[in-house]
Amino acid sequence: MKGLEGDMRMSQRNKIQRLLRKGALVTCLSLSVVCSSLSAVTAYAGPADDPAAAAPVIGPGGPGTTTDNAAAGTDTNANAGQQADNSYYNQTLSNPVVNPVDKYSYSQMVNDISALASRYPGTVTVKSIGKSADGRDIYDVIVGNPNASKKILFQGAIHAREYIVVPLMMQQLEYLAAGFTNNGTYMTQPLSNILGQVAFHFVPMLNPDGVTISQMGENGIQSEELRQTMQAAYAADKASSRTTVSYEEYMRRWKANARGVDLNYNFAANWEGINVSLTHPSANGYKGTNPLSEPESQAIANLIQGTGFNAVINYHAMGNVIYWDTQNNQKAAESKALANAVHALNGYSVLGSKGVGGLKDWLQQAAGIPGITIEVGRSTCPVSFSEYPAIWNQNKAVPATLGYYVATH
């Protein structure tokens, strides 16, 4: 059995390598050149001693459909989640900062971000990119060299009830930081090499108010005005038969921000045609008064426009699928290449989609940045925490895999 397992790992490793070599609209280096080019780069040793640069910036913080309305896919990789070689991702961290639990909350995330910045000074840097409607900071956590020539963004929890992606992304970034510190490898290469070439940005919880609503109900919201908005949204949806569930269940299924706007319908990508009949705030589906009407969508748009990302990865739930396309996609080939690389790693189905108003759609149409949406889990949102071990195993090495892609294109 051990020999067979080794053969399976080698087969998957070869599959990933072939996809990473394919490239998108440019000619990719062969794997031997990729590895030698990465090896030739001086391993990232962190910035010069600068207390200000190392200090975390932590402020006070006080049932599901797939994102693009496509059918859930089927895992096609029987070895999904099994890593290709004796990499750092096959090891278990000792004394980890991040300990995933059901309903992993905003306050837990903030505490863990602060602890990671303290444990890995110079490797993990933190900044707030804005505040939510209810006053919570929205954090961008950078792993690696912030001034690297290549940059990749991982964004999660734009939809409130999909909060299972938050501990996933927090563990992903911790593994990158720990791998650098402990001389970890992936695909036979030191993680420090890629961390010198690529800055990994993580926004694990873009919609902290919404996540708090889905986990705690309206009592988690500080603003009385926002609580009244939520109550009015329920009354309007109840009157129009958009919902028949109790108020408590309505809160649990909440997808929007605290102002009742679906943030993934709040971007200028065929926005005018979205849900024209829904004109009031709601737990889901309301696009807002205009694109980027919300502080959370403004925060992520400003980060993207001001940083120059080479790729953006959006984590959602549910379906075990990867979406890569949109209308008028300016980065179709590159986006499809990213999707194929993730599929080779975890076996999620690769699907095209023609979504409107979403962050991925805006990235590909207007911003000219390759992007994909990865939908994790199979149960109705909020996805059962019993699925988390499988989700982690399938996605733990996604950042390293896509980091290699970005580094070589």
Where in this protein do the model-derived segments appear?
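Bacterial Sec-dependent N-terminal signal peptides
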Residues: M1-V26
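Bacterial N-terminal signal peptides
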Residues: A24-S37
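Sec-dependent signal peptide cleavage junction
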Residues: V34-A54
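Short glycine- and acidic-rich boundary segments immediately preceding or forming the N-terminal edge
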Residues: A40, A54-D134
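Loop/turn elements at helix/coil->beta-strand transitions in domains of secreted/extracellular proteins
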Residues: P121-T125, D134-I138, A148-K151, G196-H201, ...
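Short beta-strand-to-loop junctions in surface cap/lid or active-site-entrance loops
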Residues: D140-A148, A157
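Active-site/substrate-binding loop(s) of hydrolase catalytic cores
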Residues: I164, Q171-L173, A177-Y323
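Metallocarboxypeptidase
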Residues: F267-H409
